[in-house]
Structure formats: structure tokens, C-alpha cells
Amino acid sequence: MATQQPCRPKSKPPACHVRLPPEPPLKLKVVGLFKSSSFQVSKTIAETLKTSYPYRFEDPVIVPLQEFAWDQFLEEKKRELKGETWVYSSYVMCFVNDQLLGNAFDLKKWAQKVWDVIDVRPSALYEALTLDYATKFLKDTKHDFVYLDICIDLSPIGRLIFELYCDACPRTCTNFQVLCTGTSGFSERGTKLHYKDSIFHRVVQNGWIQGGDIVQGRGDDGESIYGPTFEDENFSIPHNKRGVLGMVNKGHHTNGSQFYITLQAAPYLDKKYVAFGQLIEGTHVLKQLELVPTENERPLLLCSIADSGVLYT
């Protein structure tokens, strides 16, 4: 009888080496006021992280905003994120994979603790970088910039600064710009072609504020640098946000000197009124004008333009 063979232990299957997929690269996003040093610090750190770990980070998304746009962005984020963001006071927001990390200090601390990236650049260097960046940022727009210094009952409340889309509406922008400087002197009928000392004569709640009647300030007159009126140049700029600057008219091709600033998106003005600029600084000034008490849309306090002119030339 054959002897029974002892049971041999079953051989172990070869170890299975599972190759895990690589982690997706992180997305860094920096949104901030273009002329703040904290924005420049955050921008530099984000770019340094990408350079130091090219496969761990996507190219950072850098979003420079002018003051008015930054204030609008910050308000939207406060409503969206709530919590501690209600008291957020920095001029920059840093995001990792679309989640708020914090301000420049938070990004700097995270870069050092997690990635061993230490920023030792002096603050004086960042101030110089900020100035250079801001100058180039404005120059690259190829737009003109003007200001209106505002008073309520003769008390100064601040400055409104507008970006003029001279590439889209060159003739309309030139009219507004020259009326800000007063360099055209007087019209044939003796009107001083200057916004200085003119008033805001109308405030439409949730609509717009209106000024620029340089004749008598009643709101029924005005004059352009080209004559009493000039044509509608085009309707390419939409009324899609707060702070849009446009020309008042009495019908097609009747633009003069009167203008309006929207208080919210006003698509019903599209294709009827020529928008040609955007408020970029003066959030608190526009808010104060908006809150002036009125009677039949006429301000009960004197809202005047103490001075006006051109910036960044």
C-alpha cells in the first residue's frame, strides 16, 4: 500500500503591489486688492510654492482687483462663508482647492509648516514690488482714469475714481474726461464746460445717482464738449453691476454732460443709454450719496463736486 504523502503547505500567492494613483496637484488661488502689499506677499508665496513643488501644485490663480471690485467680492464672500469672515479685514483672500485658507499671514504660516517654504523678503521689498505691480496693472488696462471729489452740504466725504473704457467708447470717454479737467473752457452759449461745482440732482433708490447738469443744476439741461449734444457711440458696455458709469440722454443721440452711476445691476438700461466706465474706488462715498434723504428723488442735502480731474497719466 502506498504511503500517503504528507500534505504540503500551499504556497503563498505573490504579494500584490498596488500602485496608488498620484495625488492631484493642489490649486492655489489668491484674490486681493491689487495695490496692497499683503496681496503681493500672497502672490509671491503662491508662485514660490509652485516653483518649489512643480508637481504638487497647479499654476496659481492670481486675481488682482481694484478697490470697488474687491469690496464687492469681500461682501459676497462674507455672505457665502459667514462665520468668522464677517469680521475679515485683510486685503487678500487665499484659497487651497477652493477652500478659504486665510490672509497673507495664514498662507505664509501654512507654506512654512507644511512645505518648509520660508519667506524672508523684507517688507521694504514688498512695498517696492507693490508699487511696480500697481503701476503696470493700471498701465496694462490702456484705459483712462478720472476722479470726482465729493461734498455733502459742503463737507468733503471723499473721492470717486472711475476707469474709462476709452477703447470701447473713445468719443464718449473724451467728453467726460475733458469735462473733468475743464480744459475746453466755455461753450458758445457761455456754459462753463467743467464738472467742478456741479451737483448730483437725483438719487433713485436701488437704481442710480445722477449729476452733471453743468448749466443750472436743475437736471433738465447739460452740454457736451462737442456742442449741445452728441451721438450714442455704442452700447457695448452692459449695466451688469453696481458702479457702472453712463451718459444720461433724452432719447437717441442726445448725450450732453449729465451722467449716472448705477447702484446695482440695471439691465433695463442696456441698448438705451451709453455706459462707458466703472467706479473703481470710492465705495464708501457712493454709499453715502445713496443714503442721502430725498424728496421726489431730489436730494435734500447739497451733493456737489468740489473738484475733478485726471489720474495716473
UniProtKB/Swiss-Prot annotation:
Entry GO MF terms: peptidyl-prolyl cis-trans isomerase activity
SUPFAM superfamilies, per database record: Cyclophilin-like
InterPro entries documented for this protein: Cyclophilin-like_dom_sf, Cyclophilin-type_PPIase_dom
Stored PROSITE patterns: CSA_PPIASE_2
Family affiliation: Belongs to the cyclophilin-type PPIase family.
Described function: Probable inactive PPIase with no peptidyl-prolyl cis-trans isomerase activity.
Protein name as annotated: Probable inactive peptidyl-prolyl cis-trans isomerase-like 6
Native organism taxonomy: Eukaryota, Metazoa, Chordata, Craniata, Vertebrata
Gene encoding the protein: Ppil6
